[in-house]
From Swiss-Prot:
Composition bias type Polar residues, residue spans: 109-118
Catalytic activity field: acetyl-CoA + n malonyl-CoA + 2n NADPH + 4n H(+) = a long-chain-acyl-CoA + n CoA + n CO2 + 2n NADP(+); a fatty acyl-[ACP] + malonyl-[ACP] + H(+) = a 3-oxoacyl-[ACP] + holo-[ACP] + CO2; a (3R)-hydroxyacyl-[ACP] + NADP(+) = a 3-oxoacyl-[ACP] + NADPH + H(+)
Protein name: Fatty acid synthase subunit alpha
InterPro entries hit by this protein: Acyl_Trfase/lysoPLipase, Fas_alpha_ACP, FAS_alpha_su_C, FAS_alpha_yeast, FASI_helical, Fungal_FAS, Ketoacyl_synth_AS, Ketoacyl_synth_N
Reported cofactor(s): pantetheine 4'-phosphate
Location of O-(pantetheine 4'-phosphoryl)serine modifications: S180
Native organism: Cochliobolus carbonum
Residue intervals of the Ketosynthase family 3 (KS3) domain: 1004-1476
Region (Disordered) residue spans: 94-121
Length: 1547
């Protein structure tokens, strides 16, 4: 059989393929009964089988011959992974090394056997005379692995340190720093590694001594624990074809390491294992070389090298034969693999060639020529044309604006502010604002106006005109509410605004709101209306007069567009179309506007326009549209008429494309595109609308088309096909009568003159004055828009339905002779004037230099000063006592128990926009200040502070680029880093680099269960893993002994179930991640803490320190000068806590990845508060951990306030922290709670627009990560210490909801915060009068004074009784005078404390929470908590829902109170009422307030300095972290048991 195979292969290679003869030879001449094919599949045997069936089957049956044909699957064993590893390794320099074998010297004679083998494999063989070979280094003497080294390695890996950093003189107990969980984990590993050899209390024995103790009886090899670590390292970090056996073989051949030295080597490799799997041979080689370098350095040895030897003696030849034989076998095996590959390739090529042969030639030619029309089209039309016709219309991206009823409240608030001023500057704004309010007025806004008037009367406005103005607007609103909104043309050049004073405005509003505008001329000048005929433009006096009347009416009475549907194309920034849109919305029109620049910036511009000008009933629909695309034209018309209520009344096709600098000789694809936009597709658009009206039978409502004509009929030149496009539109007027669409469209041509400030005319604005000097009139864009809007709202529109009309707003431009030349002269004059001015300036400069000298000039320029960036904390501005506090003091002084008043003294946050300061900048303005940019750039690691010598050797103190180490001037930071900062902050597309485990929603990992259909190659594993595999898979796994001790070969068989990773795409791709590059290490937090704790704890640590600094605290132990250690509490909460640790505990542990042994503790929600206390405070106070989903922070505030009011604490940290991880994001998405970001993108929304909780289009919330912390203290303590006070927490409450089945459903339980008996709002009753008297602050003050008189009487009586008792004691000889004096002092102290307690209780009962008195609560919590400070519900100036930033213009001190509400999944309704700090200052005297200011000033300066130094030095948090408790260890019990213990001598 072997001979047959060799002959067959020789025959096949020696001659052209003669397979038919070969078959006949095997089946006929040789009569072979068994035919075996060696190859990848049954290729040849199948062919032979068919031949046998056709020619030999009947003969064989007659002769009784039974033939069988065997393919590879019938005779081959399944591929074995270990064998494949050996096969690949044998072809390399050393077994697993990916290097070619050494060259063979041409003088070495190979053996006969070797030559024969080469011939049989088809490998060309030379006849060398001599071989030079690398001799592996000699095997080094084996030494056992020291036990102390194993112990150090185990401890180092648990501590996330290098073993070199572990001193053998230290004990394990000292190294772990008291972390009991970590201690137990290490001890468990020791017992597993050295079973039966671990002494008692090993944690208290130095590592060196521990190693000596456990080395007795140790075999010098790796134990169970370290062997498992080595195996995991190899299986997870080495390439798939590298098992432990191949690694050990490599170490032996490369460096001569014996087994125990290999153990030491591998243990070192475990410690220094790479972060990710090594994928290339070079990376494996480099990794092992690096480990070898360090290993031999530790052993004090040089790295052994293979020696090259030329072998000529017989002895060496014998040694060479073994090496060469191994290589030859590798060559043979490699050749066999190549043969198999070539057979497969050949078969594949045959199939491909056959397929190609069956393909018709004309098909190939057609595919070859398919690109020719495309190339021709691009050549003809050009790239600019191709790019300009790309469709962009998408109905899903529509933006709808219709909430005029909401924006009016902003207008009314602005009206209240403006009407207070008594100057002419506010008059124009006041009139325009009044118009907008009248156009938007509704019942809800009337209530708002009425309330504003009432408040103005109550507050006693200093400006009496203020109330009259508001009253006038209110009375006018009552009239206009029943009328349609109107557009008033206030932009004409023929009208002026006359200020008649507020009195004049008030009286005019009573008569007519628009009498402030007085026309100078009744008729507009030079605006003729007519029609185009064969003889040209013919003026119609009748129509001209009609238009003049309409213009006059638009300026005096106004025009309305209620019920009109309008389509506008070409309403970009500063355009005429945008001005028309503004007027249409003012008049109540429903408008569709298209834009070819559909960005968040554009949509925001239109939203702001609607907010300002949208009137009652008006609607604005914004849609992306490219008028250069026929697809978009069709899509737009079909989209509009899907809703027949939007049948169009007006079409304003003003989209245009500028064509500057294109003459007849250089018309290009841009000119063709412009012609398509301004003519071809404009006509198609009109045709589509006409077609839709016709198909729906709409013949009584023709749409009026305002065609944009131009007086420029080529008179300016160099404008491409612009003039041709405009002139061609005039032909449409003739087609109105000659074609059949006159019932559906009416035409009005508008000759648009020189309009300043538009995009098309921007370059010509500088010569507009010269044009007017030539006798033509130029227009502003608002003025032109006003005239066009008047055309639409006047009587001319009706006339257009009879015949097309043309309105000449050209301003006489076409009458100027030689306009082109005169404009050129004007430009030339401007250039000459500019050059003359430059020459004069240069002459003056030279004269200055000649007088003062060049040196002084350089000095002047070199001393330019730039402001330096100062990173500092922001503090609340303290109010003036006489102006802001004294008016309140009369009623509030000493009215409340300040020990139970809760105030906020500090706060901080870490979130998508950085901290609270940078977030405020971005949410207020959308831009960053230089300080804000520098702070974020530092936070993201883009810059760092440097003090020292710069690259050029000069001393430097300032900012440095973290990457290039280049010095960065302060004034360059904003321009250099702002774009990068904005790109990687805020709500944005998820960045996998900063996600836990590199989560990428584009490739979300999951596992797919698969049942094996065939056996897999074997892989190497430890005996323990092999046993686990057998336990799981049973008879579907085969285990055999491996090539090294303790290793097994495991083969999964067909039928075994495995899980295979897959990556899918998840549609939640946007989140609010913290700024990219944020690192806790930048704040000085040590690697040990970073490795130990969960990220949420790191967030909280940083925020806590910044909150302390915001509170003016530079050392946490300063608290204990004023309070006991049990009076500092922590109520920081979270909805899920350490999500990153939770994921590791479940997923990574399941996948057998390295996980800390104490990971469980980091998943507890209260662990964050515990770490803060252990690292910063050392408090013995309460830790309470609220869990309230989205309402967690308000629940925390509620819990903290309760602790202080109940006197269980005097200082409480409150807030919440959340992380963003893959699993929670997926589950929120599954329950449709978060917005589908892909759907949002389809609707044209950018990431920063996806979180919009107050919008009607809200489609779910957007997840984010970060932390927010507040410091709460009692008001008494804050005033005593001089802490900044940001607000008073007047009331907090949590509310559940009714029966239901939906956990996330928002409830109405917070309404209970307004609970009170119904009759308190009704007619007066005895009960009602009593309840209302409690709300009166003056009445309660009288009651409190009466109670204080009683307490004073109690003190007097108690002192009298004490004197009597002392007298009796003095008569008793059993007591010494010292005893009596001590007794007297104790009793006096008791009387004083009791009086203070009673007075505090009285103030609390009649001040803080008077509204809780009685079994039947008569006053609602909201009403009562405000009344305690002399306020009512109308004093709540700001209401924030779910914590969104609100920008409040003007004087922030005008805000008296605010309400914050939030709702969390699981019926967590919450509300908090906050009050301005000046009300607290009104409860103390002026002297006390001045003392507070002095303390506050010193404290804030110190905190600002600490903050700046922390950023500069990179130790902002680390300087706060404590190593010891605030008291000596031996005094711990005394401090815990004695409530009077305080920290003394604190500096």
């Amino acid at each position: 059989m072997e001979m047959l195979t060799i002959d067959d292969r020789s025959h096949q290679f020696a001659y052209p393929v003669r397979w038919i003869e070969t078959q006949h030879h095997i089946l006929s001449e040789l009569d072979s009964e068994r035919v075996v094919e060696v190859g990848p599949a049954n290729i040849l045997t199948n062919m032979m089988k068919k031949t046998w069936e056709q020619q030999f089957a009947n003969i064989d049956q007659a002769l009784g011959i039974e033939r069988k044909f065997f393919g590879p699957r019938d005779v081959f064993f399944p591929p074995n992974r270990e064998n494949m590893d050996m096969l690949r390794a044998a072809s390399k320099k050393t077994l697993p090394e990916a290097h070619p074998p050494p060259p063979i010297d041409s003088h070495q004679e190979p053996s006969t056997q070797t030559q024969a083998t080469h011939r049989s494999a088809g490998v060309p063989v030379s006849l060398p005379q001599q071989i030079a070979t690398n001799i592996p280094p000699a095997i080094l003497e084996d030494v056992s692995l020291p036990v102390s080294t194993i112990v150090r390695s185990l401890v180092a890996m648990k501590l996330r340190k290098r073993s070199d950093d572990i001193s053998e003189d230290q004990t394990i107990n000292r190294l772990v720093g008291g972390r009991s969980t970590l201690m137990n984990e290490i001890l468990g590993d020791l017992h597993a590694e050295f079973p039966g050899h671990v002494p008692e209390r090993p944690d208290d024995i130095p590592i060196k001594d521990l190693g000596e103790t456990m080395s007795i009886g140790h075999n010098g090899r790796l134990g169970k624990c370290t062997a498992s670590l080595v195996n995991k390292m190899i299986s997870s970090k080495m390439p798939g074809n590298w098992g432990q056996s191949s690694v050990r073989q490599f170490l032996q051949q490369k460096w001569g390491l014996a087994p125990m030295r290999q153990d030491a080597f591998l243990l070192l490799a475990v410690e220094k294992q790479p972060a990710t799997r090594l994928s290339t041979p070079d990376s494996v080689d480099q990794f092992l070389v690096d480990i070898a370098t360090e290993y031999f350095k530790k052993e004090g040895m040089s790295i052994p090298q293979a020696t090259q030897q030329e072998n000529s003696s017989q002895d060496s030849t014998a040694r060479i034969v073994d090496v060469q034989g191994l290589r030859t076998a590798a060559v043979v095996d490699t050749a066999m693999v190549k043969d198999i590959i070539e057979v497969l390739k050949g078969y594949s090529n045959q199939q491909g060639n056959a397929l190609e042969a069956t393909m018709p030639h004309h098909t190939i030619d057609a595919s070859h020529n398919a690109s020719e029309p495309v190339d021709l089209w691009l050549t003809e039309h050009g790239d600019e044309y191709a790019a300009g016709i790309q469709p962009m219309f998408d109905g899903q991206k529509e933006r709808l604006y219709d909430s005029y009823w909401n924006w009016i409240h902003q207008d009314i608030t602005e009206l209240v502010t403006l009407s207070r001023a008594d100057d002419s500057d506010s008059y124009p704004g006041l009139v325009g604002l009044t118009m907008r309010i009248l156009n938007k007025i509704c019942d809800r806004s009337l209530d708002h106006l009425s309330y504003a008037i009432t408040q103005a009367k109550i507050s006693g406005s200093r400006n009496p005109i203020h109330i009259q103005t508001l009253q006038s607007v209110y009375e006018s609103s009552l009239i206009f509410k029943a009328k349609n909104p109107i557009f008033l043309n206030r932009t004409g050049g023929d009208t002026t605004a006359r200020y008649t004073g507020h009195d004049g405005l008030v009286s005019s509003l009573m008569k007519h709101v628009y009498d402030g505008f007085i026309p100078k001329d009744t008729l507009p000048l030079d605006i003729p209306v007519g029609k185009l005929t064969g003889q040209g433009f013919v003026i119609s006096p009748t129509h001209t007069k009609m238009f003049a009347t309409d213009v006059d009416r638009s300026r005096v009475l106004g025009l309305t567009f209620v019920g009109k549907n309008v389509l506008i194309t070409g309403a970009g920034k500063n355009s005429i179309g945008l001005g028309i849109l503004r007027h249409l919305l003012s008049g109540g029109a429903r408008v569709i506007v298209t834009t070819s620049s559909y960005t968040s910036k554009t949509t925001r511009m239109y939203q702001e326009l609607y907010a300002k000008h949208g009137s009652r009933g008006s609607i604005l629909r914004l849609i992306p549209f490219n008028q250069g695309s026929w697809h978009d034209v069709q899509g737009l018309t079909e989209w509009i008429y899907k809703d027949e209520s939007w049948d169009l009344d007006f079409i304003i096709p003003f989209a245009a494309v500028p064509e500057r600098g294109r003459s007849l000789e250089n018309l290009d694809s841009g000119s063709e595109l412009a012609h398509r936009v301004m003519l071809t597709n404009l006509l198609r658009l009109l045709g589509g609308i006409s077609r839709n009206k016709r198909s729906r039978g709409i013949v009584t409502r023709p749409a009026t088309v305002l065609l944009p004509f131009s007086p420029n009929h080529g008179i300016l030149g160099n404008d491409g096909l612009y003039s041709e496009s405009k002139v061609s539109l005039e032909i449409l007027l003739n087609k109105w009568a000659s074609e059949s669409w006159a019932d559906f469209l009416s035409l009005m041509g508008v000759i648009i003159g020189w309009t300043r400030g538009t995009g098309l005319m921007a370059e010509n604005d500088e010569i507009a004055d010269a044009v007017e000097k030539l006798g033509a009139k130029t227009f502003s864009s608002d003025e032109m828009a006003g005239y066009i809007a008047t055309l639409m709202g006047g009587t001319i529109t009706t006339e257009c339905q009879k015949e097309p009309l043309v309105v000449d707003l050209g301003g006489g431009l076409s009458r100027i002779q030689n306009l082109k030349g005169q404009l050129a002269d004007a430009r030339k004059a401007l250039r000459e004037s500019a050059e003359l001015q430059r020459a004069v300036a240069e002459a003056n400069l030279r004269q200055s230099i000649s007088i003062s000298g060049e040196t002084s000039r350089k000095t002047s320029s070199s001393t330019t000063l730039h402001p330096r960036i100062s990173l500092k904390l922001s503090w609340p501005q303290l109010p003036d006592y006489n102006q802001d506090i004294s008016p309140l003091s009369d009623s509030l002084l000493d009215m409340l128990d300040l020990s139970r008043v809760v105030v906020i003294t500090g706060f901080s946050e870490l979130g998508p926009h950085g901290n609270s300061r940078t977030r405020w900048e971005l949410e207020r303005n959308g831009t960053l200040s230089p300080e804000g940019c520098a702070e974020l750039a530092w936070m993201m690691g883009l810059i760092q502070h440097h003090s020292g010598i710069s690259k050029d050797g000069s001393p430097f103190s300032g900012w440095m680029d973290s990457t290039t180490k280049e010095l960065v001037e302060d004034f360059d930071i904003l321009s250099r880093y702002e774009s990068r900062v904005l790109k990687h902050t805020g709500i944005r597309k998820i960045e996998p680099d900063i996600c836990d485990s590199g989560y990428d929603p584009e490739r979300k990992e999951s596992l797919q269960e698969i049942v094996l259909q065939r056996d897999l190659p074997a892989f190497e594993s430890t005996a323990e893993v092999a046993d686990d595999m057998m336990r799981k898979h049973g008879d579907r796994v085969a285990v055999t002994n491996g090539t090294s001790d303790g290793m097994r070969l495991v083969q999964l068989k067909a039928g075994a179930v495995i899980w295979v990773p897959r990556a899918s795409r998840f549609n939640r791709t946007v989140a609010g991640q913290i700024p990219s590059g944020w690192s806790a290490k930048r704040y000085g937090i040590s690697d040990e803490i970073i490795e130990q704790v969960d990220p949420v704890t790191l967030f909280s640590l940083v925020c806590t320190v910044e909150a302390l600094l915001s509170s003016g605290i530079t050392d946490p132990y300063e608290w204990y000068q004023h309070i006991h250690i049990s009076e500092l509490g922590n109520c920081i909460g979270s909805s899920m806590g350490g999500l990153s640790s939770l994921k590791k505990m479940h997923r990574d542990r399941y996948l057998d990845r390295p996980v800390k042994g104490d990971i469980l503790q980091e998943t507890f929600i209260n662990t964050t508060a515990a770490w803060i206390n252990m690292l910063l405070f050392s408090s013995a106070g309460p830790i309470k951990t609220p869990v309230g989903a989205c309402a967690t922070s308000l629940e925390s505030l509620d819990t903290g306030r309760d602790l202080i009011v109940a006197k269980k604490a005097k200082i409480v940290l409150v807030g919440g922290v959340e992380d963003f991880v893959e699993d929670v994001s997926y589950e929120f998405g599954s329950m449709k709670a978060t917005c589908d970001t892909e759907a949002e993108i389809r609707h044209g929304r950018s990431p920063d627009e996806m979180s919009r909780p107050m919008a009607s289009s809200r489609a779910g919330f957007v997840e984010a990560q970060g932390c927010g912390i507040q410091v709460l203290t009692s008001a008494e303590l804050a005033l005593k210490m001089g802490l900044p006070i940001y607000g008073i927490v007047a009331y907090t409450n949590m509310s559940a909801d009714k029966i239901g089945r939906s956990v996330p459903a928002a409830g109405r339980g917070v309404l209970t915060n307004a609970r009170e008996p119904a009759h308190i709002r009704g007619p007066e009753t005895t009960y009602n009068v009593l309840s209302r008297s409690l709300l009166n602050l003056t009445h309660r003050r009288q009651m409190l004074q009466e109670r204080r008189s009683q307490i004073s009487a109690f003190v007097t009586d108690s002192n009298r009784l004490l004197d009597e008792e002392i007298a009796n004691l003095e008569q008793n000889s059993d007591f010494t005078q010292e005893d009596i004096t001590r007794f007297r002092l104790q009793q006096l102290r008791f009387i004083h404390e009791e009086a203070s307690r009673q007075e505090a209780d009285a103030a609390f009962a009649l001040g803080n929470e008077f509204w809780k008195s009685g079994s039947n609560q008569a006053v609602s919590p909201i009403r009562g908590s405000l009344a305690a400070w002399g306020l009512d519900v109308d004093d709540i100036c700001v209401a924030s829902l779910h914590g969104k930033t609100l920008q409040v213009e003007g004087d922030h001190s005008c805000i008296k109170a605010c309400s914050v509400t939030s709702f969390g999944f699981g019926q967590k309704g919450s509300q908090a009422i906050l009050i301005h700090p000046r009300y607290l200052f009104a409860t103390i005297s002026k002297t006390q307030y001045e003392e507070y200011i002095a303390k506050n000033s010193i404290r804030l300066k110190r905190a600002s300095q600490t903050y700046s130094e922390g950023i500069i030095n990179g130790d902002l948090v680390s300087k706060f972290i404590k190593e010891h408790q605030p008291y000596p260890a031996q005094d711990e019990e005394a401090w815990l048991l004695n409530p009077a213990m305080r920290l003394k001598n604190f500096s």
